[in-house]
Structures are given as structure tokens and as C-alpha cells.
Amino acid sequence: MEDFVRQCFNPMIVELAEKAMKEYGEDPKIETNKFAAICTHLEVCFMYSDFHFIDERGESIIVEPGDPNALLKHRFEIIEGRDRTVAWTVVNSICNTTGVEKPKFLPDLYDYKENRFIEIGVTRREVHIYYLEKANKIKSEKTHIHIFSFTGEEMATKADYTLDEESRARIKTRLFTIRQEMASRGLWDSFVNPREAKRQLKKDLRSQEPCAGSPTKVSHRTSPALKTLEPMWMDSNRTAALRASFLKCPKK
């Protein structure tokens, strides 16, 4: 699973996921399913935001990479993936500027067009079950919830899906392709079933013990499906700016 994650996701997303896990004392090399889940969630947050801008009239527009009108304001502020201290600073700044209610939990995004925080969910289970869990945890009607599944289903607060159908389809296609590629590698079942994943982890650790010092052969062959997984959707200019912002540790 770790090899799959490193091949599948943008290096910045992998780095952010590793940083987040290490912040909580978790090892991406051991908790590989969680590593994959965090990377997936981060990528959906970025895809949700990418290419969406607000024009001078306050209307939401989509601008493709390389478009000369790149000086527009991004519609979404990405909060997920930032250092917690920085993330809360961003949230407080938004609340002070817009007057929106401060959330009790860190949200994933802020929508400048609709003036609301957004909680993004990516689930391997039924979307309505995960939606209710999120809603019960947040306990705020001010934070908008949008849940995606690996099967193409989605659920959002008051059936308001925020994005246009094409943008949402892009996210659903990406998730479905990740699922298909995991399945082709025999990784999907353990990703869905945590108990099976733990059993597999113990089995893998036992099999590695006798030859811990020997080199590991890693296949670098890229399957046709994985080629479609390569994350080409990210705006390179924004990626560089986000990388500098997200990975910069605050001084203590």
C-alpha cells in the first residue's frame, strides 16, 4: 500500500500526509491504510478548490491552467493540510473579516462565494451513515458538509453540492479509479476492512523478520490504470505557493 500511495499521489500531498501523521505519532510505513485515506482526503480537498475563482462581480467561474486571467481570487481557501496553529489563524482571520461563526472543529475549506466553511468527507462506507456521523460531530448548521464515496455516490447539506456537475464528476472519477487500481493490486479489501488490514500487517511484519537486513525489490512498473491516476489536475503555480505555505512550520 505504501508503494501505491507514493506512486499514486502528488508528492506534495504525500509530504503533507506524512507530516500530519507524524504530528500525532503515527508511522505512514506501518499505518498504510490511514496514510492512503489521508492522501485521498487531501487530494479531494485540492480538487474541490482547484480552478474555481471569483470574478470582479463576485460570480464563481472556472479557469483552466495556463489561462491569462489567473489574477482572480480563489473561490476556496484550503484549510486542511496546514499546521494546526496556522490553520486556526486562517480560520480566525476569515471569521474576523467575514463575520461568520467560528467553528468548533477545524473545517477543510472556506467558500468565499457562499460565505461558509466546508467539511469534506471521503468514505468507504454508505454516504448517508458517514454524513450523519460528521453532522453529529460538528453540531453546527453553519458548516456545510459534502461527502463523497469511492462508488460515485455523494451527499451534501440540503442537497446543495456547491460545485458544478463536471467538477464533481472529476472527483468521483478519480476516487473510482483509485478504488479500481487498489482492487487490481489486492489492496482494496484490506482498505475497506480495518480488521483484515491489521491481520495482514501482522502477517507482513512476521514475513519480514528473517530478512530484515536484505534489500527489498520494488516494482516500478506502471499499469495503464495507474497512468490515469497520476495527478495532473493541480495548478503548478498554486502548488508551489501552497507547498511553501503548508509546509512552513511556525516558529515556537
UniProtKB/Swiss-Prot annotation:
Q: The organism sits in which domain of life?
A: Viruses
Which Pfam families does the record cross-reference, listed alphabetically?
Answer: Flu_PA
Residues of the region (Disordered) are: 202-223
Active-site feature positions: 80, 108
What is the first-listed, main subcellular location in coarse terms? host cell
Please name the InterPro entries in this protein's record.
Answer: PA/PA-X, PA/PA-X_sf
Recorded GO terms, molecular function? RNA binding
From the record, what ranges are coiled-coil? none
Signal peptide positions on this chain: none
- UniProt KW keywords: Decay of host mRNAs by virus, Eukaryotic host gene expression shutoff by virus, Host cytoplasm, Host gene expression shutoff by virus, Host mRNA suppression by virus, Host nucleus, Host-virus interaction
Q: Where in the cell is it found?
A: Host cytoplasm; Host nucleus
Q: Which family does it belong to?
A: Belongs to the influenza viruses PA-X family.
Q: What is the recorded name of this protein? A: Protein PA-X
